[in-house]
Structure formats: C-alpha cells, structure tokens
Amino acid sequence: MTDKRVTAILFDLDGTLIDTNELIIASYLHTLDHYCPGQFKREDVLPFIGPPLYETFSGINAEKCDEMISMYRAFNHEKHDELVTEYETVYETLDELKKAGYQLGIVTTKLRDTVNMGLKLTGIGAFFDTVVTLDDVKHPKPDPEPVRLALSRLGCDPSEAIMVGDNYHDVMAGKNAGTKTAGVAWTIKGAQTLSAYEPDYMLEKMSDLLHITGVK
C-alpha cells in the first residue's frame, strides 16, 4: 500500500535503526547483578527494553534508582561501540528517502550523548533534520509530547507523518500524536506482540518504507 501524503518519517533509535539490544540487555544485567544478585536473567530484562530507565529502576528499587541509572549508563557507554550495529537496509533506505525529499527525524527516550554515539558509530546522523531526546521533553513516549515536538520542528502536520518503532511506546506515541504508525518485525519482543497495538504498517525490513512512500 502506497501513501503519498506522507512528507515526514520519525524513527525510534534503539531496536529500530540500530541494534542496541545486546548492549541494553548487558547493561541491565550488569546493574541488576550488582543491586539484586541472582534475581534477574536475560528473559527477565526483555520487558525493560523501551521504557525510560527511571521507570524501570524506580519500580525495582526506588531508593537506589539514581545509583542504578548511573551504573547502567557508565557500563552502557563503556561497551557501546563494541556491541552496537545498524540493522540491514537502514542506511540505504534513509539515503533514498532523503534524496526523495522526505523530512526525517528521530524520537527516542535516550539522552543526547548516547544518541550521538550511536549516530556517529553507524554514520546515519546526517540524514536527520531533527533529533528529539529525553533531554528535550518532560513526558517521554508513549506521551505524544516528543512526537509533537519533532513535528513542530519539521513544520509537519501529524496526518503527513509516520512514526516508526520497535516498541509499543513508539506506536502509541504516534497514535496519541495523530500520526500514522509502523512497527518493525525485527523487534526483540516479537512482531506479534507489537501487532497487538495495531500499527498502520508492519515493516519486514526498513526498505519497506520505500514502497509505502512510493519512492520505489
């Protein structure tokens, strides 16, 4: 299905454009093994991928939340370049969309410093007209605030935009802001889980966007 009304595409970063899953899992396990020895295994931390760190750690130990976030971020920074890669067809798709005149943005719950690390490592930063991070908003996804901020910066109406992501936070943020939405089938939580939130599209690979927009 082609939708030529679209003029802007917003992307989540982690798990959507770049594969940070192993980095996130390792960062959680490193932190939780210190504060909650023996209580968390790999499968236990998968639900933590997507929500803001504060939301996750405050639910585990409110008193130690800030300490846990600091430990997580220190480990995450240390191991970042070792464990992060871009997903297949991402670079080529962004390049094609940019050449075709689409406005592109990132809407993420990460802090700007780690966002910049990922963009630099994968070389995709130059494709984006705006990047909205956790530093920029009071209410992260699934609240519509970060999506609305990105659209405001781009001068784009929600009806002309697609929000792309691997997590229900992304789909719901787009819906709450009035955009179309696209889930990604490579989400670590499984495409079926994401489909339950009824995104308008489900991408099997990022280059599917070229067909949705009519670029190819």
Curated annotation (Swiss-Prot):
Its EC number is 3.6.1.1. CDD domains: HAD_PPase (cd02616). SUPFAM superfamilies: HAD-like (SSF56784). The active site is at 12 (nucleophile). It comes from the Bacteria. Keywords: Hydrolase, Magnesium. InterPro entries: HAD-like_hydrolase_sf (IPR050155), HAD-like_sf (IPR036412), HAD-SF_hydro_IA (IPR006439), HAD_2 (IPR041492), HAD_sf (IPR023214), PGP-like_dom2 (IPR023198), Pyrophosphatase_Ppax (IPR023733). It is an enzyme of class 3 (hydrolase). GO terms for cellular component: cytosol. Its cofactor is Mg(2+). GO terms for biological process: DNA repair. Pfam families: HAD_2. It catalyses: diphosphate + H2O = 2 phosphate + H(+). One of its GO terms (molecular function) is inorganic diphosphate phosphatase activity. Belongs to the HAD-like hydrolase superfamily. PpaX family. Hydrolyzes pyrophosphate formed during P-Ser-HPr dephosphorylation by HPrK/P. Might play a role in controlling the intracellular pyrophosphate pool. This is Pyrophosphatase PpaX. It comes from Bacillus velezensis (strain DSM 23117 / BGSC 10A6 / LMG 26770 / FZB42). The lineage of its organism: Bacteria, Bacillati, Bacillota, Bacilli, Bacillales. The gene is ppaX.
